[in-house]
Amino acid sequence: MCRQFMYRLGIDLGGTNIVAGVVDENYEIIAKASCKTNVPRPESEICDSMADVALKAIEKAKLTIDDIESIGIGVPGAVNPKTGVIEYSANLFFHNWQVVKMMEERLNTKICVENDANAAALGEYLAGSAKGAKNAIAITLGTGIGGGIIINGKIYSGSNYAGAELGHMVIVKDGKECACGRKGCWEAYASATGLINLTKQEILKENFDFSYMLKSCDGDINKVTGKTAFDAVLAGDANAKAVIDEYIGYLACGLVNIINIFQPDILCIGGGISNQGENLLAPLRTIVEKERYTKHNDKQTVICKASLGTVSYTHLRAHETLRHL
């Protein structure tokens, strides 16, 4: 008997992890698998890893590749969804990578690729926190910062498929070096990587015997994550609070710039750090409200947590793209 619904699969190719998930008709992830990205390494090896985690996720869902209607791959950087080529990705160290062709050879099913934050924005617009909005922006906090912009219900990707690289606006002149080659980019300060670096810097300034942040990482500074400082704040660590306050200040700086330029109805924040919920969002909103250009309260941008996971919105982008082929 034929299945009435063909499942879809989303792959999030990040600078740190590759995550694949099978998604059902309710946009729910029913199974997923992951591995480390381990860049830099050859394109063929990355494709092998993506195919491997995809098949593992399908197996966990007790399905076969024949049950998968389409696969969407979300990638940071300049992505041409029409040609299936990743033209440039600073955090993955790739130029002109024909990822769709290589993945279709491995999995023998329909595949599309999209900038991960564009996919996030579309997913939130179609089925998430931005559903019903006319204009929306999604940012993803990960190895870098991705940005996706919806204007009048359509993704804005610019003339070279590299629009909305919001993480690469400079917020500190001659500041920290970014993977893109510039200095002072927003993502060098406000990405998960930026928070991890701030946390490590604070730990190195502390007395190791009394560092709650270090103790929470079993004394290994290399185990610091984006959660470390937040967890330490909840335990009453004043040094950790200083880290979080500085981090949220950097994050707010970029958000105010974005809101002043675009004035979206909703701005959704995704990525692992967004799981901190109101511990992140409440102080963030306070700063944005104080610094935004528009001061009247009749219609202000709503800042909220993205409600869909990465693999969910990459599958949605695949569905929308392939539906129009």
PLM-predicted stretches and their roles:
Residues 2-70, 80-83, 101-109, 126-133, ...:
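ATP-binding/phosphotransfer module of carbohydrate and carboxylate kinases, centering on a glycine-rich
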Residues 12-16, 140-144, 162:
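A short acidic Gly-Thr/Ser loop motif
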Residues 23-24, 123, 148-152, 156-158, ...:
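Short beta-strand-to-turn element immediately C-terminal to the catalytic PLP-Schiff-base lysine
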Residues 33-35, 90, 159:
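Short hydrophobic alpha-helix segments
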Residues 111-115:
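General beta-strand structural signal in soluble alpha/beta enzymes
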